[in-house]
Amino acid sequence: MDSKDQTMFYNFGDDSIEEDVKKLMKQVYVALEEKGYNPVNQIVGYLLSGDPAYIPRHKDARSLIRRLERDEIIEELVKAYLKNNEIGEK
């Protein structure tokens, strides 16, 4: 069997970043709203591209969002979505 056909496991290991991500996302969201941007569109643009230009410097939002790896933010967003929609672990 080709190794590309096998499922790979991805484990971040540390679940303690949930509160860090939550606090950071709130701050970035507020900064984006205050500047008149659509926060969801801008955050998605940053997470997909890695380009910090999607996040303004207002209220130090650009520096804040770069403190965490994008994959850590995405992991927490997916976990929150699944939990809020009662999908997966109870």
Curated annotation (Swiss-Prot):
HAMAP family: UPF0297. InterPro entries: IreB. NCBIfam families: PRK05473.1 (NF003997). Belongs to the UPF0297 family. It comes from Listeria welshimeri serovar 6b (strain ATCC 35897 / DSM 20650 / CCUG 15529 / CIP 8149 / NCTC 11857 / SLCC 5334 / V8). This is UPF0297 protein lwe1516.
